[in-house]
Amino acid sequence: MTQLAIGKPTPLGAHYDGQGVNFTLFSAHAERVELCVFDANGQEHRYDLPGHSGDIWHGYLPDARPGLRYGYRVHGPWQPAEGHRFNPAKLLIDPCARQIDGEFKDNPLLHAGHNEPDYRDNAAIAPKCVVVVDHYDWEDDAPPRTPWGSTIIYEAHVKGLTYLHPEIPVEIRGTYKALGHPVMINYLKQLGITALELLPVAQFASEPRLQRMGLSNYWGYNPVAMFALHPAYACSPETALDEFRDAIKALHKAGIEVILDIVLNHSAELDLDGPLFSLRGIDNRSYYWIREDGDYHNWTGCGNTLNLSHPAVVDYASACLRYWVETCHVDGFRFDLAAVMGRTPEFRQDAPLFTAIQNCPVLSQVKLIAEPWDIAPGGYQVGNFPPLFAEWNDHFRDAARRFWLHYDLPLGAFAGRFAASSDVFKRNDRLPSAAINLVTAHDGFTLRDCVCFNHKHNEANGEENRDGTNNNYSNNHGKEGLGGTLDLVERRRDSIHALLTTLLLSQGTPMLLAGDEHGHSQHGNNNAYCQDNQLTWLDWSQASSGLTAFTAALIHLRKRIPALVENRWWEEGDGNVRWLNRYAQPLSTDEWQNGPKQLQILLSDRFLIAINATLEVTEIVLPAGEWHAIPPFAGEDNPVITAVWQGPAHGLCVFQR
C-alpha cells in the first residue's frame, strides 16, 4: 500500500502537482487526522496524515490523480461542555474542497450526536470531496472595474433568472451557462446594468427540516463547501467551474461585473441538533463562537456563528475570497449578515478579517458590500463598516416606501435618504457610493407585491405564516392581492413608477431586484427562501415590456446626470442639488418638517425631479427657464415645454432645461 509522504503545510486543501496530491487540514485540537480515499468501487483506504506543522496537518499521496474522491476522519476528545465534538466514525468534508460528489440528504448517520457521540460509521452515504486540476484559458479577460459612481447592481438568482426564459435554449435554462448566453447579456446591457449580483453559488445544503417538509433551500444561504460551486446550477457537475467562468468571461466582454453573495457568518451544520458535515468535526472550538456551556452563540439565527476573529478562520475566509477572485475573476462580494465579520466578539472596524482584507492586494481592489447587521445585541451596524465597504442602506428602503406608500415621512427625512443618507455614511472618508440604495431585495416583498399586499402570505413555507417580517411598509391600494379594476391597476403602476424613479435617480449606488423591472410577483410571500418553483422563477412570458422600458429609460437618464455619477457629496451652493418647494422657492424649516409632500429636486442645474406625493392634483411651478419633460415621462420626439406642471396625485415627473 502506498505510504503518505510528509508533504507541505500550504496551501490549504488538496492540490495536484502533476505527480501526486498534497493534502492539508487545519485543526488546533485534533489528536490524529486520517485521510480517507475511495476507489472506483467505493472501497475506502485510510492514511494517517504524517505532517503536523503548528495546527496544520498535511501529507502527500504519490501517484494520486484528479478525480480522486476523499474525506477526513478527525480524532480528538468528545467533550461537549468544552466545545469539542470529535467523532472519527463520521467522514468529513475538506473545508477547502473544490468539488463535492454526493448529496447532503437528511439522514441520521450524518449527525454526530448531541450529548453522546453517535459512533455509527457514515462513509457509505456521506458526500465525498473530489481532487480537481485547474486549467482554464481566460484569453484576454480583464475586470471591467466600473467606477462606483457609475455602478448599477442587479440582484438575481442563477436558476430563477433564466429557468423560464423562452429565448434561452431549454438545456441550459437555470444554469451558469445561461448567465453568459447572448440573450441574457443583451437584456442586461439594454437595461443598463453594470453589475450582476448573484445569490450564493458556493455549495449549500437544504436544512433537514425543509427536506422533511418536501421543500428545499432555494436562496442558498446555508453553505457547506465555500470553495465549491453549487452543482445543481451546472449542466454537468464535472464542468461547473468552467461553465461559471465562461459566463463571467462573456459578461466581462460586455462590460458587466459579477458580484457574489457570500455567506461567511455560519455553516449548514446549524445548531447542536444539526448535521455534521465538516467544521464541527474538524475543530468545533476554533471554527465557531462557543458559549461557556459548550453550545453555540447563535448570532445569525441559523444555529451557529463562525468565529472570524480566530487567526485560522480568518486565513480560511481570506483564502476563500481570494479563490473566487483569482480563479473565477469575480469583481466583488456582498457579505451576508456581515456584522459577524467584525465580531471580536464586539463589533470593531479593525477586526482581524477586516484588517486582512484591507491588507490584501487582491481583496482590497474589488467591490465589497456588507449587509451591515446580524441578530445579536449590537448587531445593527449600518454606517459603521470600514471605508473599503459599501453597505445595504435599509434606511433608504424604508424611507422610500413610507414616503410613497404610507405617506408618513417628512420631506426632510426623504431628502436625507435621497442624498445618499449622508447623516449615516459621510464619515471616515467614505463616498456617497457607500450607500447601496434598494427598495426591494431577495428578502422581502417584490416591488409589485409592495403595491398589491398589505400583509405577508407565507403559508407555503410551512411555518403557519410566522416567518418573514411584518414591517413591510406596503400598500395594496384598497384590495389585497393581484388584479383589480383599471383604476386600481393604474394607481399601483404609478406607485411602482415613483419608487423606481426614487431608487434610480437618487444619490448612492442603486440595486435593482431582478424581476422588479417587469412586474414579477411572489403572490405576497416575503420570505421565499424555500420556494424553488414558479413563485420565485421569473416568468418572462408575463413580463411587462412597458415597465421594463420605463426602468431602462430611468437608468440611462441617471447616467446623464453628473450629480449622480460623479460620486461626490453634495454641498451647499456647489451646483449639484437644490431643494425647492411647489413654488420653486427654497424650502423653509417648517416645510421640511411639516409641509405638504411636494418637492422639486434640481440636479446639476438642468435636471428637475418634480414630486407631488399628496392625494390631490397640484400645480407645481417650475424654476425659471424652458423645461421639457424627458423619457420615460415623455417621448423623445414630442417634448412638452412647460412652466407649470399639473402634478397628479402620488405622481412625479423629470424635466430638463
Curated annotation (Swiss-Prot):
This is Glycogen debranching enzyme. It comes from Escherichia coli (strain SMS-3-5 / SECEC). Belongs to the glycosyl hydrolase 13 family. Keywords: Carbohydrate metabolism, Glycogen metabolism, Glycosidase, Hydrolase. The keyword Transcription regulation does not apply. Its EC number is 3.2.1.196. The lineage of its organism: Bacteria, Pseudomonadati, Pseudomonadota, Gammaproteobacteria, Enterobacterales. The gene is glgX. Removes maltotriose and maltotetraose chains that are attached by 1,6-alpha-linkage to the limit dextrin main chain, generating a debranched limit dextrin. GO terms for molecular function: glycogen debranching enzyme activity; hydrolase activity, hydrolyzing O-glycosyl compounds.
